[in-house]
């Protein structure tokens, strides 16, 4: 269904605010995940460690609300996701809520673990579409889920 002008106008009026919140929260989340020993890798262009950081900085005012990260070997991706209290498991993007999904269980599921590994998709890779929740609440949720 296509949005009517009546439905689309309120969404467009708050778009800049939502993108600003999503981007700032995503950067904060990427930083705390990158600093955690239980996280193997974080993929977010707002991090100086990202190979495309300089390009993203030249092109964009903000880095967006989408990031992904890998848990260290031996950590159960699904157990981690089940410990999240604020983030919602879902495959869509761009919601006002933070959405998470294990990447291996999206469109790549039918490829099998060997093919995914050859493409650089770890079984513990989690995609996060950051919403507009309070940033500190979001950071707390992702931190507490890392606890065994």
Language-model regions: role of each:
Residues 10-17, 64-72, 127-131:
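Short, well-ordered beta-strand elements within core beta-sheets of diverse protein domains
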Residues 18, 75, 98-148:
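PLP-dependent enzyme catalytic core of the Aspartate aminotransferase-like
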Residues 8, 19, 36:
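Ligand-binding pocket scaffold of soluble enzyme catalytic domains
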Residues 27-91, 95, 111-117:
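Conserved small-domain helix->loop->beta segment predominantly found in fold-type I
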Residues 2, 14, 98:
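Ser/Thr-centric signal marking residues that sit
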């Amino acid at each position: 269904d296509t949005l009517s002008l009546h439905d689309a106008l309120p969404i467009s009026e708050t778009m800049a605010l939502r993108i600003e919140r999503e981007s700032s929260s995503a950067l904060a989340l990427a930083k705390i995940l990158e600093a955690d020993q239980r996280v193997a890798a974080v993929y977010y262009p707002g991090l100086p460690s990202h190979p495309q950081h300089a390009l993203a900085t030249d092109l964009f005012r903000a880095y967006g609300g989408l990031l992904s990260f890998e848990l260290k070997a031996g950590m159960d991706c699904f157990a981690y996701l089940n410990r999240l209290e604020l983030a919602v498991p879902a495959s869509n993007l761009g919601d006002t809520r933070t959405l998470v999904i294990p990447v291996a269980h999206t469109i790549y599921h039918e490829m099998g673990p060997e093919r995914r590994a050859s493409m650089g998709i770890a079984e513990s890779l989690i995609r996060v579409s950051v919403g507009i929740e309070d940033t500190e609440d979001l950071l707390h949720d992702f931190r507490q889920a890392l606890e065994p």
